Amino acid sequence: AIFSDTKNCLEYLYVGDYGKEANIKADFLGLTKEINGVIHKKVDLEDKMVVTISTQKGCPMKCKFCDCPKVGFHGNADISDLRAEVMSAIVRSGCQHTKRFNLHLARMGEPSFNWNNIKIYLLCYLKDDVSVFMDADVIHPVFTTMLPRTLGSKTLKRIITEFCQVKNYEFRGEAGLQLSINSTDEYQRNDLFRGRSLS
């Protein structure tokens, strides 16, 4: 289910699984060929719940494959916004127990532009916010970045290193890092990201 908080310019969702048939980005890129031999099975929320939240109110990256440019950019989500998105998604799901709770920092916004708030949220609030409303055997945050050129490689390296420390020490290895590449062709990648991502 997708939720829009128009007052705070935020959007978030929860799903059990979001298979290829719902992959808008793959369709945009023309990746419509069905993969035979891979059986898609719907995942029950009690087995795996995926909550995807906005880390910014809109996004300054303006990628060609995304609808965020239509929203505009209205700043970073603050810690109370991050908390409200997660707790609201859990409550609205009605799920009280899950074996695996994945939090994807990937709905609207580029998380590296809001790293300070995200780091505080992951270190100080996420586990408590989940445990108030559900019993989760594993809590697994996922940091997805487009590697924005404006931050520079030194700052991006620091942010990724700090996230890996949060992963290793706060979540005992239970966290993921995703690099949003979208194409291995450098020209196509630069076009899709409008030259705003490191190659």
Name each region found by the language model.
Residues D5, G16, K57, L147, ...:
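Non-catalytic surface loops within mature trypsin-like serine protease
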Residues A1, E11-L13, M61, A84, ...:
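SAM-dependent transferase fold signal centered on methyltransferase-like domains
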Residues Y12, I53, L177-L179:
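Short beta-strand motif preference
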Residues F28, K70-G72, D191-S197:
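Short glycine-enriched, charge-decorated loop/helix-capping segments at active-site entrances
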Residues A1-M49:
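Flexible, acidic/Gly-rich N-terminal and inter-domain linker regions that tether
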Residues G19, P69-F73, T184-Y187:
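A short, flexible beta-alpha/helix-coil linker loop
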Residues I35-N36, V43-S88:
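Canonical Radical SAM [4Fe-4S] cluster-binding loop centered on the CxxxCxxC motif
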Residues I90-S199:
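Conserved AdoMet/S-adenosylmethionine-binding subsite of the radical SAM
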